[in-house]
């Protein structure tokens, strides 16, 4: 459950000031989840960072720089994180009579939704950001890069301007990937401490969207639980005018959506899918209730969650993601609950494991790319 940072303060008069009515509705929703036996995956920061409505759209528009800000432990983003974690985890729920941090209903906590999307743009943000509000963050990145090089007894050099495939990559670009991965470690450890100090003892996840191996190395060092997000036939511009998506079957592509998500799974670690769906505009949408849930059950994943709302009070047309407005997606949700949740498909007895040596990550910009599509097919084996 995320975007709470765009709900509980939105109608208040100040940023980081609770709207009592909205916060009560959130507390009641937690209670109802518990009554229905639903486990909760909670995201602390997502898009609006507990801003009131006059500032919320501006914060949303700057979502990538704000992710970078949290990555480099910028005070603006860290303060918003501390606020959200304190209110959501440490408040005694008037309906359940306990803190969420102590409630077995809470399955896992994500620090910042799809954090590494910001990490993808660190080098371009550093060189081309023109917003004066983020100038101090640019300076912070430059100082962190210098410190990183000094710790390795390396000569100072500029932040790279690009990272790409092919023979034009320099050793500096490979080094910069290590730098970004290290910064993700630092932000994870900082957020982890905040949550542990509040008494949360369960799973903490981060870097849930990108399939780049470099982010997997950070997950491996930091967390015993891995989460991933992904969509089949994700529209090119979401639901905006001119958006396009492809019209092939997910079965035809040998379940590439599942294989892509499963490729970030790590041996011996709990694995969950915090967001997945089969987009509305793809004519094979009815496959969304069978292909992904069945394979996730077959491979023994711990949890899966459709994106997004199973119920919506808005009177709007069918969208690409909202289950509430789409009867086919609603049916897919039921089938997913049967195949995965009820256990109609049992996990395979064997798994294929792909070993990625550290030497591979040091070669060129290998770390910048995901697992090869052919290699990801081990997810279909048993």
Please report, for each region that a protein language model flagged, where it lies by residue.
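Single-residue recognition of alpha-helix boundary sites
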Residues: 121-125, 235, 286
